[in-house]
Amino acid sequence: MGTETEYLQSIQQALKSLTTAANNCQLTYTHAVGQDVHSLCAREAVRKTLVLEAYKFLQIAQGPVDAAVTCFEQTAHLASVRALLEAGVFEVLPTDGTPRTMKEVAEKLDVDESLLARLMRHASLYGPLEETGPGSYRHTPFSLVYLRPEIRGMVRFAMDEHMPAHLKLHEYLQQTSWTAPSSSTNNPYTHAHSITGTSMFANLSAPSNKHRLDAFNDAMTVQATTAIWMIDLFPFHEVLSPSASADTVLAVDIGGGTGRAISRIRSLAGNLPGRYILQDQAHVISNLPSPSPSSYLDGIETMTHDFFTPQPVAGAQIYLIRRCLHNWPEESVIRILRNIVPAMARTNSRLLIEEIIVPESNSGIEEGWMDMIMMALGAKQRTLEEWKGVLGTAGLEVVTVYRVDGICHGLIEARVKSE
């Protein structure tokens, strides 16, 4: 690593970069205070920069060897948290921050006190729990979050489903001569779980795997509730026809899940009269709440549809696919898009795709780990040029790309190719 002087100098330089990022974060949070998409993106961009600089500072402070050794530390920490979650420790600690001894927690859960002490010891080094004295621990804001069912489900999904795939990634790539995975039924995930020939989605949908599907749905809920709505960048009120009648199909959300996006579009359009249609598979549609004047689904039509089949609604002004296509290999993405194209009117139909758009260089943390997850499933996060490629092959062309600096998510507007 060089001399001690060089080490200390590198720490000081990293600290300067971290301090600058912290100051920028404070400044932005002070001025960009709104809940509009531009303010939200501004705050998120500086926060991500701060986190990245903090990681860099930590790595420099550790030095090359210790930084490499943290693979033991990180996996051990994840394992301890996962075990404590399953044991029920987070539920029995008082939420007001009052400490509890290991003896009390062990008796409450009927577990080995010495085992619990070892797990808790590691889970309190830098969180999420806090050690308050010998054998005594309490909640922190970083452990209280594990009381949320969707967070617990997300952790289970990440560690039980995806971690085995990551650990076996090198093995799978060696067996496939280091070729990028491109199949939803033959990939690092199917290899790790010994289900080659079956996709993750099909496997989780089996009745015997309901608990695993529930964890997946919890993970998707976390993603949906923490994401910034990039569709807010699109001028719906200006684009959608003000002369639309009640029969005009204004927007179709394909694979729209719970319907939050199509409901948001209706609001962004100023509740223009017309049809707003939510499409998804039967099991999703059947679990939606009943529409009512007080429901967010008020004014939204629901329709069972599999996007691997031809789009049944023709001539809609807007077709939306939000955060779906990254889950599929290129061949499947093209198939999905080709099922939409014949339904689009050349004159006024637009396809909006909200997805991560991976930068050509200097990509951030989120798009990095998200792409690794997609790699495990034979899919990928795409650069703008890669998005243009799959759209072009399907008979579409990019018209406009809506993005905000520092944010990897964006909105692509496409139309049927000109003849």
From Swiss-Prot:
Q: Which cofactor does it need?
A: S-adenosyl-L-methionine
The pathway this protein participates in, as annotated, is: Secondary metabolite biosynthesis
List the active-site residues.
H326
MF (Gene Ontology)? O-methyltransferase activity; protein dimerization activity
Keyword list (alphabetical) reads: Methyltransferase, S-adenosyl-L-methionine, Transferase
The enzyme's E.C. designation = 2.1.1.-
Gene Ontology biological process terms, A to Z: methylation; secondary metabolite biosynthetic process
Cross-referenced SUPFAM superfamilies, in alphabetical order? S-adenosyl-L-methionine-dependent methyltransferases, Winged helix' DNA-binding domain
Q: What residues does S-adenosyl-L-methionine bind to?
A: G255, G256, D280, D306, F307, R323
Primary enzyme class: transferase
Q: Kindly give the Pfam families that the UniProt entry links to this protein.
A: Dimerisation (PF08100), Methyltransf_2 (PF00891)
User: What domain of life?
Assistant: Eukaryota
InterPro entries documented for this protein: COMT-like (IPR016461), O_MeTrfase_dom (IPR001077), Plant_O-MeTrfase_dimerisation (IPR012967), SAM-dependent_MTases_sf (IPR029063), WH-like_DNA-bd_sf (IPR036388), WH_DNA-bd_sf (IPR036390)
Q: Gene3D superfamilies per the record? A: Vaccinia Virus protein VP39, Winged helix-like DNA-binding domain superfamily/Winged helix DNA-binding domain
To which protein family does this belong?
A: Belongs to the class I-like SAM-binding methyltransferase superfamily. Cation-independent O-methyltransferase family.
Biological role: Non-reducing polyketide synthase; part of the gene cluster that mediates the biosynthesis of the bicoumarin desertorin. The non-reducing polyketide synthase desS first catalyzes the formation of the pentaketidic 4,7-dihydroxy-5-methylcoumarin from acetyl coenzyme A and 4 malonyl coenzyme A molecules. Further O-methylation by desB leads to the formation of 7-demethylsiderin. Then, an oxidative phenol coupling catalyzed by the cytochrome P450 monooxygenase desC forms the 6,8'-dimer M-desertorin A via dimerization the monomeric precursor, 7-demethylsiderin.
- Protein name per its UniProtKB record: O-methyltransferase desB
